[in-house]
Amino acid sequence: MTPYRSRTSTHGRTMAGARGLWRATGMKDEDFGKPIIAIANSFTQFVPGHVHLKDMGQLVAAEIAAAGGVAKEFNTIAVDDGIAMGHDGMLYSLPSRELIADAVEYMVNAHCADALVCISNCDKITPGMLMAAMRLNIPTIFVSGGPMEAGKVVLGGTERSVDLIDAMVVAGDAKVSDADVETIERSACPTCGSCSGMFTANSMNCLTEALGLSLPGNGSALATHVARRGLFEEAGRRIVDLAKRRYEHDDESTLPRAIASFKAFENAMSVDIAMGGSTNTVLHLLAAAQEGEVPFTMADIDRLSRRIPHLCKVSPSTADFYMEDVHRAGGVMGIMGELSRAGLLHEDLPTVHTPTLKAALDHWDIRRPVDDAVRAFFRAAPGGVRTVVPFSTDRLWDSLDDDRETGCIRDLDHAYSRDGGLAVLYGNLAPNGCIVKTAGVDASILTFTGTVRLCESQDEAVARILGGEIQAGDVVLVRYEGPKGGPGMQEMLYPTSYLKSRGLGKVCALVTDGRFSGGSSGLSIGHVSPEAAAGGPIGLVEEGDIIVIDIPARSIVVDLSDEELAARRSAMEARGRAGWKPAKPRKRAVSPALRAYAALTTSADRGAVRDVSQVER
């Protein structure tokens, strides 16, 4: 039997003071000796994906108490990437991931909690909590707030679904009237929950499910549907069971590092590739793997991207399907079921809810014989009412989407492509790799040669696009926006949205050492590593250079000889401290907090995690 961690502060004469403090929180004699379960909530009124989470911690806590545990809730911060987008607020988004990971670690270790429930939802919150879970390696379950419903709008007499990206795109299109822009704006985000497409938030919540760290349906059940309530309640019950198995029966299969093993990371990345998830997931999975000492790297992602088919295309890659449609088609379990039938999944792995993934698929994959309760769960439908109230609808679809030929989730024989929705490119521009979401790239530009239009910041890129300087055949190259150079690795959602609104989405490329929102599509290549501020070749490119992109060959090169690149590098190094910095001044206030982040962070190929060895002696 492994002693409960919490005994450090609850047992023994010398802990009388600590017990006195525990009693002041409401604990009674009979509570000492029970597992203490930390609930990391992320409620905030700033973020629609988190605005409904205020009472979720206590919902989980009630189930923990009923199952024989003691629940203690705390909160983390949560940044809304959409609100922080397009201005200096975005500098803080990625660094907030590290703050969240640290906050969870600090609270759990300072108070010797035995296990953890992570209530997350949006872009950096789920990754930050995942990093913390892998560091701490105590029993952990994730339960997210769920996706929002897709918006509905009637324009020109036709109803169609819309989301946040539609509002951004039409706002940059001078041909769209102010009235229509306002109509879409008012319709784009109708409910609480994470934005309704396969953007970063929903991608990451799907991937915690694929890793085995959350319950079936976590990635896809709508925030507004009563079906999600059951996930919170079940998480409270199961975490107590996991804690007792770990400490009372020495069952190490309950630990995050046992569940989220190398094979589980392969599974999660395979799901990501199959569903054409956000490119940010690459960054976050690499970071989580490093925290858990799992040797999962860009090379593994490259290998998987060449063999995993693209089975699911969701907004922003199409206007036909949204997260509510993914759920109706069976959710993550439906995608994993197709990968299983194709022989592309490790199934002998534990999860927080079943001894093996195979057992989970046997129960939850809608194309296998499943019971009526499972079928009803995946029929959970949007209520179609503007609301910030969770669990406010019990509406059901009339039927499931089990069409694997043309439905939301396809089988191997009807895949969009035999290689997946994400790809890693290498070449003299990105020796350590870069990422492209191929699910969002038009087939006509899978190979592309273009002329560099050099931008030393996202702001300059926006100005050049809206100013009419970018033409068909151009490569908008945005540098010094990486983790160190930004700092903070800004998302380039506005530049990609404005390229689309200007009719350039299928005739231009955007290449950057920054990153892209999960809402970006088009030939958008990010995470170029090493970044410019770290001495990467992207810092040597000049206006008018030619870049050659070949996605099928997984290649990206600037058309320069090795000798020319070496000469440019020598000239850059000769500038001393002035080298490897933007050639043009930027109006950007970088606070001491951001400078500290920049001093410790690494390039995207390492997940932009901190490397404290840079300052250790």
Curated annotation (Swiss-Prot):
It catalyses: (2R)-2,3-dihydroxy-3-methylbutanoate = 3-methyl-2-oxobutanoate + H2O; (2R,3R)-2,3-dihydroxy-3-methylpentanoate = (S)-3-methyl-2-oxopentanoate + H2O. Keywords: 2Fe-2S, Amino-acid biosynthesis, Branched-chain amino acid biosynthesis, Iron, Iron-sulfur, Lyase, Magnesium, Metal-binding. The keyword Magnesium applies. Its EC number is 4.2.1.9. Signal peptide: none annotated. It is an enzyme of class 4 (lyase). Pathway: Amino-acid biosynthesis; L-isoleucine biosynthesis; L-isoleucine from 2-oxobutanoate: step 3/4; Amino-acid biosynthesis; L-valine biosynthesis; L-valine from pyruvate: step 3/4. GO terms for cellular component: cytosol. [2Fe-2S] cluster binds at C122, C195. GO terms for biological process: isoleucine biosynthetic process; L-valine biosynthetic process. The modification N6-carboxylysine is found at K124. Belongs to the IlvD/Edd family. Homodimer. This is Dihydroxy-acid dehydratase.
